[in-house]
Amino acid sequence: MSTLKKPDLSDPALRAKLAKGMGHNYYGEPAWPNDLLYVFPVVIFGTIGLCTGLAIMDPTMIGEPADPFATPLEILPEWYLYPVFQILRILPNKLLGIACMAGVPLGLMLVPFIESVNKFQNPFRRPVATAIFLFGTVVTIWLGIGATFPIDISLTLGLF
């Protein structure tokens, strides 16, 4: 038994539509050659030309010029590495910090096994997964903001 519904080719209305050319490509213009030969190259070359033109006409300086003789007090990583940097900074043992970072994807792999709910359901009907996601988001934002503070107030964000 198949789960796909097959068309009834004995239906005269359907046969009339198929005779006129109705099929999988009935609506709109065909992708070949209209889109692939004419529209796509215009968009691709237009985007490349726009980016090149902006880079030539308005080159922006990113930050201050490098000074090899002046080192900042604390060198921070890129913004997307702030939570990981904060974990390594606040934990006393570096091996423990690496284990905590490895525990994040391992913990996320356990979420489907904790809940015995259909994974295709509405996410708001999966309370454990939703709670873990929200808790992880809050902790990640908290660690990311804390990485920008000095080490002595980084855990409390200077609030306490």
From Swiss-Prot:
It is a multi-pass membrane protein. The keyword Lipid metabolism does not apply. The keyword Thylakoid applies. Its main location: membrane. One of its GO terms (cellular component) is plasma membrane-derived thylakoid membrane. InterPro entries: Cyt_b/b6_C (IPR005798), Cyt_b/b6_C_sf (IPR036150), Cyt_b6/f_cplx_suIV (IPR005870), Cytochrome_b_C_euk/bac (IPR048260). CDD domains: cytochrome_b_C. Pfam families: Cytochrom_B_C (PF00032). GO terms for biological process: photosynthetic electron transport chain. Keywords: Electron transport, Membrane, Photosynthesis, Thylakoid, Transmembrane, Transmembrane helix, Transport. One of its GO terms (molecular function) is electron transporter, transferring electrons within the cyclic electron transport pathway of photosynthesis activity. It is found in: Cellular thylakoid membrane. The chain crosses the membrane at residues 36-56, 95-115, 131-151. The 4 large subunits of the cytochrome b6-f complex are cytochrome b6, subunit IV (17 kDa polypeptide, PetD), cytochrome f and the Rieske protein, while the 4 small subunits are PetG, PetL, PetM and PetN. The complex functions as a dimer. Belongs to the cytochrome b family. PetD subfamily. Component of the cytochrome b6-f complex, which mediates electron transfer between photosystem II (PSII) and photosystem I (PSI), cyclic electron flow around PSI, and state transitions. This is Cytochrome b6-f complex subunit 4.
